[in-house]
Amino acid sequence: MPIAMGLETACELECAALGALLREPREAERTLLLDCRPFLAFCRSHVRAARPVPWNALLRRRARGTPAAALACLLPDRALRARLGRGELARAVVLDESSASVAELPPDGPAHLLLAALQHEMRGGPTTVCFLRGGFKSFQTYCPDLCSEAPAQALPPAGAENSNSDPRVPIYDQGGPVEILPYLYLGSCNHSSDLQGLQACGITAVLNVSASCPNHFEGLFHYKSIPVEDNQMVEISAWFQEAISFIDSVKNSGGRVLVHCQAGISRSATICLAYLIQSHRVRLDEAFDFVKQRRGVISPNFSFMGQLLQLETQVLCH
């Protein structure tokens, strides 16, 4: 089968073959699956074992450098790159949305550049570099049980009609906390006081982004407080790294964290947006759209949005 120029040795893997590998625990552990679709598409649904590949205009420019530099941009996890370098993985599989073969990949797109970088860096080693034929769209058709679906939106946008809503309850308190990522939830102070709701979500830790909301269940959950007010004078960015480290610590321990403020609209939403920007290297507008799809009432104040834009610049231009 013809292969795109520069990718002559890339093998093409069928969806059924990948599904069989992922169903074998030993083979699944030795398979690195790299999803080159946009971040929002990945979060809506993805192969459970896959890792998202960051991509934006700046990374596009940097990925055109040396293969090692391209791989560092597209696979920023140093520990994972080290595992590849030591030959600990049997295969690295790259996928996009629906390309039928390597020959269809745009030369300046993330899948093509990542395949080329992997081939160069893995040459002569035990790791096979593969492209998934038909991409995620085909794999989801063949192996839906191996794919993860995004949770349904739990809270409608402000002003939206909802026949099940209680007019006595503020819209920001209706429903329950919303899942942003499998280990990251966003909600209000009222949600943080609902023990049954927290347990139903599997929450193990709470990040309280307020100076006034109490920590209701100190003996049951791991709490961290960021005592800031929701006003234009607050430098919430001073807390970004501390908050991100806390969320990552909960993630790494296998737990789930609820981030909340009084209404779950401005302060806690800002922290969740900062986490997405830094951890997933996405633009603010992408992160904002993603979170708003899940919690329609979010609206960080003007100053907080400016601080998030500064973070975006620092992260994406680093």
From Swiss-Prot:
Residue limits of the Tyrosine-protein phosphatase domain? 176-317
Q: What class of enzyme is it?
A: hydrolase
Which residue range or ranges hold the Rhodanese domain?
27-148
**Pfam families given for it?**
DSPc, Rhodanese
Keywords, comma-separated and alphabetical? Hydrolase, Nucleus, Protein phosphatase
| Mutagenesis / variant outcome for changing R60A | Does not affect interaction with MAPK1
**Expressing tissues:** In hematopoietic tissues such as spleen and thymus.
Q: Which reaction does it catalyse?
A: O-phospho-L-tyrosyl-[protein] + H2O = L-tyrosyl-[protein] + phosphate; O-phospho-L-threonyl-[protein] + H2O = L-threonyl-[protein] + phosphate
Tell me what happens on changing K292A. Answer: Does not affect phosphatase activity. Loss of phosphatase activity. Does not affect interaction with MAPK1
Q: What is its EC number?
A: 3.1.3.16, 3.1.3.48
User: Has keyword Hydrolase?
Assistant: yes
Q: Which residues form the active site?
A: C261
- Cross-referenced InterPro entries, in alphabetical order? Dual-sp_phosphatase_cat-dom, MKP, Prot-tyrosine_phosphatase-like, Rhodanese-like_dom, Rhodanese-like_dom_sf, Tyr_Pase_AS, Tyr_Pase_cat, Tyr_Pase_dom
Q: Where in the cell is it found?
A: Nucleus
Which signals induce this protein?
A: By mitogens.
Q: Is Hydrolase one of the keywords?
A: yes
* Annotated consequence of substituting R62A: Loss of interaction with MAPK1. Loss of interaction with MAPK1
Assembly and partners are described as: Interacts with MAPK14; this interaction does not lead to catalytic activation of DUSP2 and dephosphrylation of MAPK14.
Family named by the database record: Belongs to the protein-tyrosine phosphatase family. Non-receptor class dual specificity subfamily.
Q: What does this protein do?
A: Dephosphorylates both phosphorylated Thr and Tyr residues in MAPK1, and dephosphorylation of phosphotyrosine is slightly faster than that of phosphothreonine. Can dephosphorylate MAPK1.
Q: What is this protein called?
A: Dual specificity protein phosphatase 2
